[in-house]
Amino acid sequence: MKNLIQSILHSHLIPSCPHADLCGAGGRAWLFHQVLPEDERLAVERHLREFDRLGEDLKVIERDLARSALGNEGVKRLMTIPGVDMVVALAIAAAIGEVRRFDRPEKLVGYLGLNPSVRQSGPGPAYHGRITKQGRGHARGMLVEAAWAAARTPGPLRAFFLRVRARRGQHVAAVATARKLAVIIWHLLSKGESYAWARPALHARKLRDLELKAGYRAERGQKGAAHAYNIKSHRDQERRWVEQAEAAYARFVAGWNPRGPKRARTGAANEGRR
């Protein structure tokens, strides 16, 4: 709707709105003072009404999603992972269904299309290429978006992202982090555990936001479960804790000498060694 309104303004050489939100209170007041033909003004008003209607429908959908998330322990457990919010957690949980269908994390990775493709001819060596991109593409895209968010949050996941980015670039690092998230998600859902490096105050804040979106009453002036997140010293303490975990992970893997799988020698190679 905003783009349609912008196109009408642009067709009449009206400059861009000085307000950040064209459909906000300030933007609408600015629109009211613009000189437009009567039919174009009616079109702008029609687009604004449609924008408001869609906004109300989205609020209802968001409320229903929040209520569904609050009643699902698996979704709340996934939200302990940095970068995973309500939408990502619900999408992943819906795509996975019953996690017992996957007896190993590698099977979940393959189901989401995050495993590398393998090409092999006869007894020759196997060549690993790009990810297969098979399976649930929507969930895979959600995990990649969560990986980008996790890369901006201190913790072992960011250390992993930075390590891969230094060797392969940021896009490969994002996909590798998404695969790492899929493995973590399998373990959390299979074992009924929360993320080991979760920030309790931040998770409590996420859950409180869920309650407000679900229509729970706002209790102003009272210390709720998310009160600790409002204390800066507490937030800083949790941040230092995960930064220490990130530094420990970086030190741990600094001495690794990654090697690929051993390749079986072909007959010609064995004859040459004799």
Residue ranges and their predicted role:
Residues 1-274:
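A detector of single, family-specific signature residues
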